[in-house]
Amino acid sequence: MGLGQALSEDMRYVKGQIMNANFFDYRIPYSVDTPEMDVTIIESNDGEGPYGAKEAGEGPIHPVLPSIGNAIFDAVGVRMCELPITPDKIFTKIKELK
């Protein structure tokens, strides 16, 4: 989720209408686009969550966006402040530096 949000997912609107409301036009990463993951299951019981469950969905995506932005800054010296971060946006920022 975080990788797609940072690099490819972009909702497009024209006069309030969504122009890319399907998975053909709205680009999300496929499994082949993402790195291999090593998953570790940790058994625990949280009395606050329903049936002892803990949140495990949205929380882990938060560090992905700034990590990618900082990696780009370290590599080419430009700060990206708009998502998704695309090659053409990076190229434009690099040209603005010169």
Residue ranges and their predicted role:
Residues 1-98:
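Cofactor-binding beta-sheet edge motifs in enzyme active sites
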